[in-house]
Amino acid sequence: MRRKDSYEYRCQCFRYLLSKDILPSSEEVNDWAVPWLVFCHYAPYDFMLREPGSPKYGIPIPMFNLVYHDCLVIPWMMEKLPEEDYMLYALLNGGAPYLIRDPAYLGIDGAFTLEEEMPWEKHLERVRIVSDFHENVGDAELVKHEILDDKGFRQRSTFANGYAVEVDLQTGSYSISKE
């Protein structure tokens, strides 16, 4: 079997699931399968898979979502670490939040034990913020992304329906607007 045949057979499986009102997903997204997927399990930035505080290679930007944002639902990690708030990346990407992320293995693939757990009510508040924003932009194309300072701490994403979010990764702040 050729690779192309494998892709075609897997897409047939996804189409079959859709025909039975079953939502196909993939652990991670492959561009050849996007037309048939409804969601994936995650698509984090590279640095999110390594231990907190590990160096970043370049400035993380929502490149994948600039192409595929309005095609499928991508859930985002919501951890708030001393050095990074992942909720800001969820907003910047217009993604859905993870309510609970139960990793198979601790210490790898973005699953690291936090010294201080966030109170459940605070976590729910953050999840609601991202959920509400995703409800507004989930079907809208991500049309523009801007880096607003030299270090890439301040970034803005703009969606086709006029919503925009600006984040400051250094201060942990964000603002949502609608034009």
Name these PLM-found stretches.
Residues R2-E179:
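Active-site-proximal substrate-binding groove within the catalytic cores of carbohydrate-active enzymes
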